[in-house]
């Protein structure tokens, strides 16, 4: 859908959404987003210009539907997919893309580490109508035959440009983790739990030189500026357990991410900031406020956070609690966690569970923030319940298949789809029926 | 375990924990609770005397292990079980009791409505080491052959005493829903969604007389006082959807529950207050504060709340978000919700899912409140993760079977239980390994 839009901008020296926004231009992408969000196009433009909202939309991902991440927009969710050394076919990843889009992921990160990474990414982008994000260090490492010490800045930039050229709309870059933070890491219970972060640590320790993503940040920005790839500034030092939450390692890195944000904005590159992780409920609001402060209100993109460390097997749920609260307090996008977190690799069913958990969290956050119209679908559901319209209830549920399946376990016959009761109270003592009698006598 | 304790009190005119507490006596139950909670026995006594904590322990449930519900104690969870017209054998309910206790329910409510209710309850109590709660109106209705208009106060009191005599430790009584609230119900989107509440409505509408539980409240208190049955004052008018949350119907009933609390305390009867239901995140704290105010700090026992209405099939999760927050803000017990909520009757697997979801919520709440030692198990889990001790990780997880099962899906062989990596990053780029290298170089 973006073919013509992008085509006519061909001669512009810079083509990022932020650049246009700052020129006072409302792009077609902004118009589209305004429509989807039910907001004024001029508000979208202002938010993008201010850096408080991003529209991740690589100029080469032409069939992508524009979407916005930022506090003025609805809370978004990301789902991670990706091949591994064990399961590395493109078809499998395309299947996952379909599951993600079916259940409503707003963006998808392709975290592939096994197989032909370029070919897989090409297929993923081809089948995605949502923005695709990546963590380029995974491919850089892959191209170095898993020898992190072979990483050079040239190799790094080559891979980043290759991915940008392919149509990736945002990159997680671990540029904020500096050599001087090593002693802070050593104080932690869990150290580094970010894979990209630990790779950076390994490289820095090997050469005792500064983080190459930090050193070459300007060159990375030039690539992002060229293709309008947004940056998702990675939190290499996100806490891996409650004990490490909101500690010096995390917050010192966050300050650097704030500095990098300003650098990116100088080049009209869109930025969001990645956040934790594992955080007890009473520290979530504080984390959101600190990010807003240190990072100049760039959109906050959090991973959960998990509100306890002992929920292995149910971490989608333990993290959805933190995610819902984070969204309410002001996070703009929630990265899902699946039930397999800390235990193994998610399959398609885990992806579904993770996405629905996060749709619940993001929607609950929109309601709690009082976003216009956020509760309309809930009200429609309540009306359907009250009217015993079961098919409508299934349709309005975040996972219609699951709702229908559970209902039909007890009452499978079609006639019960209009029955004025359900299996819980049975026909004689349905609360809704009794309420309707009250209404008749006492009026509405 | 309580046989001797109860035996020696035989001649006391009143034998409720609240009575003893007010006499300055620390009972064996209080001692036991103090040990379990890691609190001073005198604090327990004071809290029980003040009505801010209850120890639901019927004098006839002698093998029950004492436990406490109140803000000074750890956050508790309740699981509901119960027969229906379709599945009404006692053995099935005993199985559910075992599942509840295995996964850590702190109390169990037997909400049976089908089969021989007395016989089922007897079996449930026999197999339960946790307090059993009931909703007597279900049996009253059953004994009236499902004709609610046949309910009389005598019949009501007879059933209540029968259940008390059997050893039920707390009763949900819908005494706060008064005739004058009918017009408030008529204003709602969803009316009444509490089954007990709708039965009361049906009776009141039929006779146009005041709620019989309210009228006979003093007689009910006498029974509770005799057997030390705690009251769980039911919220007949809990909101059934976000649109009805915190409305006049809910709050007017809550005020009456506050009045009834004082009446109960006058007779040394222990009380907790039931709460919603469906509440958007931004109203949860307010709900907790209002209850504290209206109900004189009697422990608050909430059902979820669900933070969105559109999560059918995942309502255990949508409600665990609200429950965790409620626990953090000060609710003392969380009533679980299963994935079948709004759709059908839960099976054993649903019970497991519901309980674990609520264990997560209650534990996260304890951590967020900063309870002494609450995070110790999380720290132990983090240590086990860092040491690659997989068996220890499974053991510390809230659902060890599930954690092991998910891990073994990818790496089933025994050797991987000590492997210094997992299936997520593989052996070469384990973040923990890299952190350990940093530690060697930079010290702890």
UniProtKB/Swiss-Prot annotation, chains A, B:
Co-factor note (free text): Binds 1 [4Fe-4S] cluster per subunit. The cluster is coordinated with 3 cysteines and an exchangeable S-adenosyl-L-methionine.
GO cellular component annotations of the record: cytosol
EC code(s) of this entry: 4.1.99.17
Binding site for substrate: 80, 109, 138, 174, 194-196, 235-238, 274, 301
List of residues binding Zn(2+): 278, 342
Keyword GTP-binding found: no
Catalysed reactions listed for this entry: 5-amino-1-(5-phospho-beta-D-ribosyl)imidazole + S-adenosyl-L-methionine = 4-amino-2-methyl-5-(phosphooxymethyl)pyrimidine + CO + 5'-deoxyadenosine + formate + L-methionine + 3 H(+)
InterPro entries to which the protein is assigned, alphabetical: ThiC (IPR037509), ThiC/Bza_core_dom (IPR038521), ThiC/BzaA/B (IPR002817)
Domain of life according to the entry: Bacteria
Key words of the record: 4Fe-4S, Iron, Iron-sulfur, Lyase, Metal-binding, S-adenosyl-L-methionine, Thiamine biosynthesis, Zinc
Pathway info: Cofactor biosynthesis; thiamine diphosphate biosynthesis
Keyword S-adenosyl-L-methionine: yes
Gene Ontology molecular function: 4 iron, 4 sulfur cluster binding; carbon-carbon lyase activity; zinc ion binding
Cofactors required: [4Fe-4S] cluster
GO BP field: thiamine biosynthetic process; thiamine diphosphate biosynthetic process
Chain sites annotated for binding [4Fe-4S] cluster: 422, 425, 430
PANTHER family assigned to the protein according to its UniProt record, in alphabetical order: PHOSPHOMETHYLPYRIMIDINE SYNTHASE, CHLOROPLASTIC, THIAMINE BIOSYNTHESIS PROTEIN THIC
Function: Catalyzes the synthesis of the hydroxymethylpyrimidine phosphate (HMP-P) moiety of thiamine from aminoimidazole ribotide (AIR) in a radical S-adenosyl-L-methionine (SAM)-dependent reaction.
Entries under HAMAP family matching the protein: ThiC (MF_00089)
Self-association and partners: Homodimer.
Family (UniProt): Belongs to the ThiC family.
Official protein name in the record: Phosphomethylpyrimidine synthase
Organism encoding this protein: Nitratiruptor sp. (strain SB155-2)
Lineage start: Bacteria, Pseudomonadati, Campylobacterota, Epsilonproteobacteria, Nautiliales
Gene: thiC
């Amino acid at each position: 859908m973006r073919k013509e839009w992008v085509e006519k901008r061909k001669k512009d020296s810079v083509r990022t959404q932020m650049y246009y926004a700052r020129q006072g231009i409302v792009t077609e992408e902004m118009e589209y987003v305004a429509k989807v969000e039910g907001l004024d196009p001029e508000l979208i433009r202002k938010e993008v210009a201010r850096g408080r909202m991003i529209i991740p939309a690589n100029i080469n991902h032409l069939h992508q539907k524009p979407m916005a991440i930022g506090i003025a927009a609805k809370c978004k969710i990301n789902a991670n997919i990706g091949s591994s050394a064990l399961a590395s076919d493109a078809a499998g990843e395309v299947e996952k893309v379909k599951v993600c889009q079916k259940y409503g992921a707003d963006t998808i990160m392709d975290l592939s580490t096994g197989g032909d990474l370029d070919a897989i990414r090409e297929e993923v982008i081809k089948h995605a109508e949502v923005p695709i994000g990546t963590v380029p260090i995974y491919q850089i490492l892959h191209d170095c035959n898993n020898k992190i010490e072979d990483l050079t800045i040239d190799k790094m930039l080559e891979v980043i440009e290759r991915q940008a050229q392919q149509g990736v709309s945002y990159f997680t870059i671990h540029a904020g983790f500096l050599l001087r933070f090593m002693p802070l890491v050593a104080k932690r219970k869990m150290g580094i739990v970010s894979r990209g972060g630990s790779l950076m640590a390994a490289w820095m320790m090997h050469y005792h030189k500064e983080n190459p993503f930090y050193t070459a940040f300007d060159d990375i920005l030039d690539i992002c500026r060229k293709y309008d790839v947004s940056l998702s500034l990675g939190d290499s030092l996100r806490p891996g357990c409650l004990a490490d939450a909101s500690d010096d390692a995390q917050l010192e890195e966050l300050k650097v991410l704030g500095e990098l944000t300003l650098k990116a904005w100088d080049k009209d590159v869109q930025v969001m900031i990645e956040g934790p992780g594992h955080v007890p409920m009473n520290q979530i609001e504080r984390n959101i406020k600190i990010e807003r402060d240190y990072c100049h209100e760039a959109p906050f993109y959090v991973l959960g956070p998990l509100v306890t460390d002992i929920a292995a097997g149910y971490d989608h749920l333990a993290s959805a609690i933190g995610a819902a609260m984070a969204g309410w307090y002001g996070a703009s996008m929630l990265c899902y966690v699946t039930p397999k977190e800390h235990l193994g690799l998610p399959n398609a069913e885990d992806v579904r569970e993770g996405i629905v958990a996060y749709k619940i969290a993001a929607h609950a956050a929109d309601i709690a923030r009082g976003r216009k119209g956020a509760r309309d679908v809930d009200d429609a559901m309540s009306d359907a319940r009250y009217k015993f319209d079961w098919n409508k209830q299934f349709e309005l549920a975040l996972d219609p298949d699951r709702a229908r399946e559970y209902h039909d376990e007890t009452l499978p016959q079609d006639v019960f789809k209009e029955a004025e009761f359900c299996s819980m109270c049975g026909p004689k003592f349905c609360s809704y029926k009794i309420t309707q009698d009250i209404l008749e006598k006492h009026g509405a």
